[in-house]
């Protein structure tokens, strides 16, 4: 699914609000928007499998980073895309239009009409910088 900078900003702002590290945010963004696998550790996090998440985690990952990610998932990720391995797998199998409909309903992306309107108006947009 192709997102305008306006919709991209909405999702990136949610990461910024939770202080999610860029190394965590990038795979989660790609999972939500494109249905790409976020990797074994983050798949386990999305599936609520703590033991697998920690055992598959990079040694440099920190508890505060995981806490920020967990808060972001709880507050941001649609229920259809988290909670079990089956839900994570089903999200990845959804077509772009179905994923977009869920993300629009969750307020994470704008409708294509709204994106077009903002683009035509030349509305300025500044994406948050993730660290």
Model-derived features with residue positions:
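IQ-motif-like calmodulin-binding regions
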Residues: 50
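Amphipathic alpha-helical binding modules
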Residues: 62-121
